[in-house]
């Protein structure tokens, strides 16, 4: 059975949109203006993005991710990749999508837009949100077309074991597409699921330049999969979807490998420092292991702390009262100045609630 049988039939049978006219001297086919008020190097911004520039960036990323150039397609950040995946495989009112909450809320958002079924396989905070194959098997149903792993997981910070991903790909080889969202993988001390692409045709990996690469403003990401899946995705990718300035700036940034290496190491070092400071703080009851640039903590003062930190200009992520993480905060690791300000603000909150004393449950 071909993995393409899991694609929506109406989309698989559709024709690719081919813009054409890329090499023409006079572009009289696309209704563009012949002038532009601004330019960007050699690029005339009055013209739609050049496919050649897109191919250059895809090749650059393919080399970095150690995959073949026909195994990657650019997206407008990871969100675009999630949206495309749900629309490509899920038929409204028929197919299902499995996720492992607490996780990135945009998965459920796009599944609802597609009017597909959402299968929830909850993680247990008592096990530090560790996922097992038994949990997946107990939740899976025959109409489950997509299984979504977030690794490292947002907001919990933990990795999904690569062996578990491989076993899931093998177990549901002809039944489900396995998607791994690796938005934070560069911060982890672990291999990427891209190393499994050659082995499993039902595996898709989503990557982004918004996190470790520091290019969130460019809105660039990619879908990585075996070539037949990438070719099929081209049927639903909007023409000219990636802006010329975004691609050009990304190409320039990716040439500076030393900057990325140093930045990631700095975040890891700062992460360890912040965790140590958190561990000394009596109002923080639990600190979860993290392979990301953020830290999830448990504190009974989560709501008060959110308001308190806002006075210092610090925004942190809290969670609704109905959430499993209602008494948790997700806090991003910043630069030295930001981290010190955070610790100082927490200390001032401690002074404000001085006299409180209770047992802590640290796992670090």
UniProtKB/Swiss-Prot annotation:
Keyword Ribonucleoprotein: no
Modified residues annotated as N6-(pyridoxal phosphate)lysine in this record: 211
Gene3D superfamilies cross-referenced by the UniProt entry: Aspartate Aminotransferase, domain 1, Type I PLP-dependent aspartate aminotransferase-like (Major domain)
A Pfam family of this chain: Aminotran_1_2
EC number, as in UniProt: 2.6.1.9
GO terms assigned for molecular function: histidinol-phosphate transaminase activity; pyridoxal phosphate binding
Cofactor(s) listed in the protein's UniProt record: pyridoxal 5'-phosphate
Pathway annotation: Amino-acid biosynthesis; L-histidine biosynthesis; L-histidine from 5-phospho-alpha-D-ribose 1-diphosphate: step 7/9
Keywords: Amino-acid biosynthesis, Aminotransferase, Histidine biosynthesis, Pyridoxal phosphate, Transferase
Enzyme class, broadest EC rank: transferase
Any one Gene Ontology BP term: L-histidine biosynthetic process
Catalytic activity: L-histidinol phosphate + 2-oxoglutarate = 3-(imidazol-4-yl)-2-oxopropyl phosphate + L-glutamate
The UniProt record lists the keyword Transferase: yes
Similarity remark: Belongs to the class-II pyridoxal-phosphate-dependent aminotransferase family. Histidinol-phosphate aminotransferase subfamily.
The protein's assembly and partners: Homodimer.
PANTHER family for this protein: HISTIDINOL-PHOSPHATE AMINOTRANSFERASE, HISTIDINOL-PHOSPHATE AMINOTRANSFERASE-RELATED
Protein name (database record): Histidinol-phosphate aminotransferase 1
Organism: Legionella pneumophila (strain Paris)
């Amino acid at each position: 059975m071909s993995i393409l049988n899991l694609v929506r039939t109406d989309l698989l049978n559709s024709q690719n949109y081919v813009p054409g006219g890329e090499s023409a001297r006079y572009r009289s086919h696309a209704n563009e203006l012949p002038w532009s008020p601004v330019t960007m190097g050699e690029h005339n911004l009055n013209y739609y993005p050049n496919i050649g520039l897109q191919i250059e960036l895809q090749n650059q990323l393919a080399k970095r991710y150690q995959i073949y150039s026909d195994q990657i397609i650019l997206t407008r950040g990871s969100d675009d990749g999630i949206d495309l995946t749900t629309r490509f495989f899920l038929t409204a009112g028929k197919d299902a999508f499995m996720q492992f909450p607490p996780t990135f809320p945009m998965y459920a958002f796009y599944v609802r837009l597609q009017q597909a079924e959402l299968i929830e396989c909850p993680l247990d905070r008592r096990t530090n949100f560790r996922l097992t194959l038994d949990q997946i098997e107990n939740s899976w149903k025959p109409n489950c077309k997509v299984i979504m792993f977030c690794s490292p997981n947002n907001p919990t910070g933990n990795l999904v074991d690569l062996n578990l991903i491989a076993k899931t790909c093998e177990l549901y080889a002809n039944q489900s597409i396995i998607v791994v969202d690796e938005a934070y993988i560069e911060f982890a001390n672990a291999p990427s699921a891209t190393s499994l692409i050659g082995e499993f045709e039902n595996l898709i990996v989503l990557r982004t330049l918004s996190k470790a690469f520091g290019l969130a403003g460019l809105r660039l990401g990619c879908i990585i999969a075996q070539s037949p899946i990438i070719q099929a995705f081209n049927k639903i990718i909007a023409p000219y979807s990636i802006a010329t300035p975004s691609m050009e700036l990304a190409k320039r940034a990716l040439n500076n490998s030393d900057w990325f290496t140093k930045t990631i190491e700095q975040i890891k070092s700062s992460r360890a420092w912040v965790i140590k400071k958190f561990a000394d703080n009596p109002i923080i009851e639990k600190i979860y292991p993290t392979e990301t640039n953020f830290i999830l903590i448990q504190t009974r003062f989560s709501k008060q702390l959110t308001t308190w930190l806002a006075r210092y200009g610090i925004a942190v992520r809290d969670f609704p009262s109905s959430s499993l993480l209602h008494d948790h905060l997700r806090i991003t690791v910043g630069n030295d100045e930001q981290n010190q300000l955070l610790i100082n603000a927490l200390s001032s909150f401690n002074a404000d609630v001085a006299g409180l004393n209770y047992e802590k449950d640290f796992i670090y």
